[in-house]
Regions:
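Hydrophobic packing and interface segments
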Residues: 1-738
C-alpha cells in the first residue's frame, strides 16, 4: 500500500516536538543554578532520583525480557499470536521509559534554577519551571508519534496481505506495543508512588508532627528522599502514564477506523480513517508549542491570576485544535467529517470539564476544601471523615461528564441516527467516534502535561529555597509557584483519569477486532451463530461476535468476569496502600533513629544521613511494586484461559467502571486533604504548629498514597488489563475452559 504524502506530517510533527523539547532543555540549562548550597541540594536530589531510576529500570528490564520471551513462544512456538508482537512490546516499553528518563533528568536540573529565577521575579520563576515541564510534555508526544510512525512504516512494508484486511492487521498489531508502554507505566507509577509517599509520610509524621519542624527543613533526614520522590512519582510516573494513554487512544482509534470501513471494501476511505487520529495528534503538537509561549504572569499575582496564566495557554491550544479538527477531517474527505469533528470537540470539552471539577473539589479557593480545613477544629477524625465524603461526592461530575461525552461522541459520529444507532455500520462508526473523542481530549497533551510536570518542579524549587535559607521574599514566590503546582497536579490527575476512561473504552471495542484476528490466525473462517445463521469471520460485525460468544449479562462467565474486574480495583489499591504503609514504617523508624543517635541534628549542628533515607525508599519501592504490578498482567490472562472471551469482556467492563470511579475519589480526596493543610499553613485556624495544623497533617498523610500512589495507578491498571487482553486474544481464542 502506498504511503500518502499527508502521512509524513505525523513523523515531522514528532521531530518538531523533540526539537522544541531539546531547545527548552538547553534554555533551562543556561539558567544560573544559584548559590553553592542550592547546587549542593540539587545535586543530592538528582543523584537520588537517577539512582532510583537506574534500579527500577534494571528490575523492569528483567520482567520485560521474560514477557518478551513468553510472547515469542506464543508467536513462533504455539502459533497463536502475531510474529511482530514481541518486538512491538519491547519498543513500547523502551520509548515509555525513555520519556520518563528525559522528563525526570530535566526536572532535577530545573528545580534549583527555578528557585534562583524566583529571586528575580515571580514571572521569571514561572517561565523556567513551566518550560522545563514542557520538556516532559513534548518528549512524551514526540516519542509517542515517532514510535507510531515507525511501526506503521515497518508493518506497511512487511505485512504480506492485500485488500482492506491489511490495514486491520497493521493497526491491531500496532495496538500491541501499547502493552509495553502500559507495563512500563504501571511499574513507574506504582514504584514511584510507593517511593515518594514512603518518604513524604516519614518526613511529615516525624518531622512536622513529632519534632515540630517545617516542611523541607534541612534538619529532617527524609527531606531529600521526599524531594527525590516528587520527581520519581510525579514526573517519570505521570509521563509514562500519559504516554500510554496518548499512544493507546491513537492506536485504538486507528484500529476501530480500519475495522469500521473494512466491510465496505473502500481502502482509500479506510486509510483516511486510520490516519485521522494521527494527524489530529500531529497538529495538536504544533498548537501545544504555540500555547506554551503564551504562559506568563505579573509580580504579586494571586492564585486565580496564576491559574489564569496557565489557562490561557491550554485554552488557546484547545480552541485551535477544535477548529483544526474540522479542517483535517474535511481535507481527508472522511465520511460524516462534520459529526466526527464534533466528536473531537466532545473529548476536548470533557477534558476541560473534568479538570475544572477537580480544581473545584481540591483547591482551597472553593468550599469543599475549605470545609475540610474548618473540620480540623474538632480533630483529625473529622478531617478524615469530611475528606472521604468530599472525595465520594466529587465522583459525580466526572462520571456524568464521561457518560455524556460517550453518547455525544457516538451520536455525532453516526449523524444522530438514533433509530438505527446499533446497526452494524453505525456501531462501528459510533465506536470510532468515541475513539476520536479520546484523541481530542489528549491532542493538546504537549501543554497539558507541561502544566502537570510543572508541579513537582515548583515543589522542589520551594524545597531548595527552604533548605538553602533564601530570603522570605523568594520563599513567598516559590510558595506561590508551589501552591499553583499543587492545583495543576490535582487537575492533571483528573485529566489523566478521564482520558484513561475514554481510552479504555476505545480499547474495549478494539478487543473484539483482536478476537477477529485471533480467529483468523487459528484458521477459523466461519462463525456459527446461536440463531443458526453463519458469518464469515472477516465480515462479521461486533454484534455478531457478541452473539457468538454469548456476551450477555445473563451469561454467568460474564458476571464472574464483571465481579473480578470490580474487585481488581480494590485489591490493587489495598496492596499499594499497604505497600506505602510498610515502606513508610521503615522510613519513620530511620528518621527517629537519626534524631536519637546523631547529635545536634535538631539544633542544626549535626548533618543528617540523607543517603540512608533515599536507600530505604528505593529498596522499599522496588520490593513492594512487584506483586500489584504483576497481578495486573496475570489476572486478565487467567480469566481468559478459564472463562474465555465472555469472561474477559466482563473483566474489562468491571475494571473500567469501578477503577474509574475509585480513581476519581482517591485523587480528589487526597488533593483536598493536601490543600486543606496548605490553607492552614497560610495562617487560617491557628496556622503552622497549631492543633488544627496537626489534624490536617494527619489528613494529608492519609491522602498522600490516595492521590499519588493508588489513585493514579488505577488509570494504568484499567488500560493495562485491556492491553494484556488484546495481546493475549489469540491465546484466549485458542485455549479456554468455558
Amino acid at each position: 500500500m502506498n504511503i500518502p504524502t499527508i502521512f509524513w506530517v505525523v513523523p515531522a510533527a514528532s521531530v518538531v516536538a523533540l526539537a522544541f523539547a531539546w531547545g527548552f532543555y538547553r534554555l533551562m540549562k543556561r539558567e544560573d543554578e544559584g548559590t553553592d548550597r542550592m547546587r549542593e541540594i540539587a545535586a543530592h536530589v538528582r543523584k537520588g532520583a537517577m539512582a532510583y531510576l537506574r534500579q527500577q529500570y534494571k528490575v523492569v528490564s528483567i520482567i520485560f525480557v521474560v514477557l518478551a520471551l513468553f510472547f515469542a513462544y506464543l508467536a513462533y512456538g504455539a502459533g497463536v499470536q502475531n510474529e511482530w508482537v514481541p518486538f512491538a512490546f519491547l519498543t513500547g516499553g523502551f520509548f515509555s521509559g525513555l520519556a520518563g528518563y528525559f522528563g525526570m533528568k530535566t526536572a532535577t536540573y530545573a528545580s534549583a534554577r527555578t528557585a534562583n529565577a524566583a529571586r528575580q521575579s515571580l514571572d521569571r520563576g514561572l517561565k523556567v519551571a513551566f518550560r522545563s515541564g514542557a520538556v516532559m510534555g513534548l518528549v512524551v508526544v514526540g516519542l509517542g508519534l515517532l514510535d507510531i510512525s515507525f511501526w506503521y512504516l515497518i508493518l506497511n512494508a512487511f505485512v504480506d496481505v492485500t485488500g482492506p484486511q491489511k490495514l486491520v492487521i497493521i493497526t491491531t498489531t500496532m495496538l500491541t506495543f501499547g502493552m509495553g508502554a502500559s507495563t512500563q507505566a504501571l511499574f513507574a507509577r506504582v514504584g514511584g508512588g510507593i517511593y515518594t509517599k514512603a518518604a513524604d509520610v516519614g518526613a511529615d509524621l516525624v518531622g512536622k508532627v513529632e519534632a515540630g519542624i517545617p516542611e523541607d527543613d534541612p534538619r529532617n533526614p527524609a527531606t531529600i528522599a521526599d524531594n527525590v520522590g516528587d520527581n520519581v512519582g510525579d514526573v517519570a510516573g505521570m509521563g509514562a502514564d500519559l504516554y500510554e494513554s496518548y499512544c493507546g487512544s491513537i492506536l485504538a482509534t486507528a484500529a476501530l477506523g480500519a475495522a469500521a470501513f473494512a466491510a465496505a471494501g473502500n481502502e482509500a476511505l479506510q486509510l483516511k480513517a486510520v490516519l485521522a487520529p494521527m494527524l489530529i495528534a500531529a497538529v495538536g503538537i504544533v498548537l501545544s508549542i504555540l500555547g506554551i509561549y503564551l504562559v506568563r504572569t505579573k509580580e504579586g499575582a494571586t492564585m486565580r491570576e496564576l491559574l489564569r496564566s496557565l489557562g490561557v495557554g491550554v485554552n488557546f491550544s484547545s480552541a485551535l485544535i477544535a477548529v483544526a479538527a474540522f479542517g483535517i477531517l474535511y481535507l481527508l474527505g472522511i465520511q460524516n467529517w462534520v459529526g466526527l469533528s464534533f466528536s473531537v470537540i466532545t473529548g476536548l470539552v470533557a477534558g476541560i470539564v473534568i479538570g475544572q471539577a477537580t480544581e473545584y473539589y481540591t483547591s482551597h479557593s472553593y468550599k469543599p476544601t475549605r470545609k475540610i480545613a474548618e473540620s480540623s477544629q474538632t480533630g483529625p477524625a473529622t478531617v478524615i471523615i469530611s475528606g472521604v465524603g468530599s472525595g465520594m461526592i466529587s465522583t459525580a461530575i466526572p462520571v456524568v461528564t464521561i457518560g455524556v461525552a460517550i453518547i455525544l461522541a457516538y451520536l455525532c459520529a453516526i449523524g444522530f441516527d438514533v433509530k438505527n444507532m446499533l446497526a452494524p455500520q453505525n456501531l462501528s462508526l459510533g465506536l470510532y467516534g468515541i475513539g476520536i473523542a479520546s484523541v481530542g481530549m489528549l491532542s493538546t497533551l504537549g501543554i497539558t502535561l507541561a502544566t502537570d510536570a510543572y508541579g513537582p518542579i515548583a515543589d522542589n524549587a520551594g524545597g531548595n529555597a527552604e533548605m538553602s535559607g533564601l530570603g522570605p521574599e523568594v520563599r513567598k514566590r516559590t510558595d506561590a509557584l508551589d501552591a499553583l503546582g499543587n492545583t495543576t497536579a490535582a487537575t492533571g490527575k483528573g485529566f489523566a483519569i478521564g482520558s484513561a476512561a475514554l481510552t479504555a473504552l476505545a480499547l474495549l471495542a478494539s478487543y473484539i477486532e483482536e478476537i477477529r484476528i485471533g480467529l483468523l490466525h487459528n484458521g477459523v473462517t466461519m462463525l456459527d451463530l446461536p440463531s443458526g445463521a453463519t458469518r464469515f469471520v472477516q465480515d462479521a460485525s461486533i454484534l455478531d461476535f457478541m452473539d457468538y460468544y454469548h456476551i450477555s449479562l445473563m451469561n454467568p462467565t460474564v458476571l464472574i468476569g464483571l465481579f473480578i474486574g470490580a474487585m481488581m480495583s480494590f485489591l490493587f489499591c489495598g496492596l499499594t496502600m499497604n505497600a506505602v504503609g510498610r515502606a513508610a514504617e521503615s522510613m519513620v523508624q530511620e528518621v527517629r533513629r537519626q534524631f536519637r543517635e546523631i547529635k545536634g541534628i535538631l539544633t542544626g549542628e549535626g548533618t543528617p544521613d540523607y543517603a540512608r533515607c533515599v536507600a530505604i525508599s528505593t529498596r522499599g519501592a522496588q520490593r513492594e511494586m512487584l506483586l500489584p504490578s504483576l497481578l495486573a498482567i496475570i489476572v486478565p490472562v487467567a480469566v481468559g484461559l478459564i472463562f474465555g472471551v465472555a469472561g474477559v469482556m466482563g473483566l474489562l467492563v468491571g475494571g473500567l467502571s469501578s477503577g474509574f470511579v475509585l480513581a476519581v475519589f482517591m485523587a480528589n480526596a487526597g488533593g483536598a486533604w493536601d490543600n486543606a493543610k496548605k490553607m492552614i499553613e497560610e495562617g487560617h485556624f491557628g496556622g503552622k504548629g497549631s492543633d488544627c495544623h496537626k489534624a490536617t497533617v494527619v489528613g494529608d498523610t492519609v491522602g498522600d498514597p490516595f492521590k499519588d500512589t493508588s489513585g493514579p495507578s488505577l488509570n494504568i491498571l484499567i488500560k493495562l488489563m485491556s492491553m494484556v487482553s488484546i495481546v493475549m486474544a489469540g491465546l484466549t481464542v485458542a485455549w479456554h475452559i468455558f
